[in-house]
Regions:
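Residues forming the flavin
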Residues: 1-285
Length: 285
């Protein structure tokens, strides 16, 4: 069995920052993707750091990445045990178990899917989470069909409203609360582009088969659409360690600790987790 000082789960901004802060320790960083960077790699919009886009900001984080860090990419961590062992499944090596002294969970967050919402009707083609569509448009060159309806007006919903409207599609946003939920800089698209925002309403039914044709709101308005994007919020992804309690060797950082609106806070938490883990290892010695 392989032995590491620190196992980091997640290769986004928090995981990268943690690995850099733990420089000098024997570190393994595991991530599901083909390269580190996390969700930053699919964020074509600017607003990261000094007005960079996501890939540019990720490249800056990785510029001085420690050469000694082991990277287990295209790898899923299946389980973590209280005896400080983890089971990994990777495309390159299949199953393997590793031991660690300190564990940093930097797995980010996941979107709330349609299935978790009280929406009746069929489940046709043409329904995506906002993050799925962001990845498809920015990394795969996909262009959705319009009209587009977006459920939720948080930052990710607004970012995708702007991007789909700039692609020439008709866009309607439906927000359950009485006002828009995103940051002011992201709300600017509502005045700069022909995006309709409906507040104080929600979607209660989806229509169409095999492809979506429209949806009905709680207030009874029918909205025709070829694409429905779910931007209903984000949840920290920490189920992997939910049964461990909070032992001193476990450090949870970034968006799997709490969802942060700004990447700088994610990097700060990752750095703090890496430094704390490194101090704990040195204390054991």
């Amino acid at each position: 069995m392989e032995h590491y000082d620190i196992l980091i789960i997640g290769g986004g901004a928090a995981g990268i920052a943690a690995a850099k802060a733990a420089r000098g320790a024997k570190v393994l960083l595991a991530d599901r993707k083909t390269k580190p960077g996390g969700v930053l790699l699919q964020c074509a919009h600017r607003g990261f750091g000094k007005d960079q886009n996501g890939p540019e900001y990720a490249a800056g984080l990785l510029a001085d990445f420690p050469e000694g860090v082991g990277l287990a990419l295209e790898t899923t961590v299946l389980s973590v045990s209280k005896d400080k062992t983890a089971v990994l499944s990777g495309k390159a090596f299949g199953l393997r178990a590793v031991c660690f002294k300190q564990l940093i969970l930097a797995a980010g967050c996941r979107e709330i899917p349609l299935g978790a919402l009280p929406i009746a009707g069929t489940r046709p083609k043409g329904i995506y989470t906002a993050g799925q569509m962001q990845e498809m448009m920015n990394l795969q060159g996909f262009t959705p069909e319009g009209p587009v309806v977006i459920l939720g007006s948080g930052d990710l919903g607004l970012i995708m409203a702007k991007q789909t409207a700039e692609a020439g599609l008709s866009v309607t946003m439906v927000e359950q609360k009485t006002q828009c939920g995103g940051m002011a800089k992201n709300q600017r698209c509502l005045t700069e582009l022909p995006i309709r925002l409906i507040c104080g309403d929600t979607i209660t039914q989806v229509h169409g088969h095999p492809h979506i044709e429209g949806c009905t709101t709680k207030n009874g308005e029918y909205l025709p659409c070829e694409t429905l994007l779910i931007a209903a919020g984000l949840r920290p992804e920490r189920e992997l360690v939910s049964e461990l309690g909070r032992p001193g060797w476990l450090h949870i950082c970034g968006n799997c600790n709490t969802v942060h609106p700004m990447v700088e806070a994610v990097v700060k938490e990752g750095t703090r987790a890496g430094l704390t883990a490194l101090e704990n290892i040195r204390g054991d010695l």
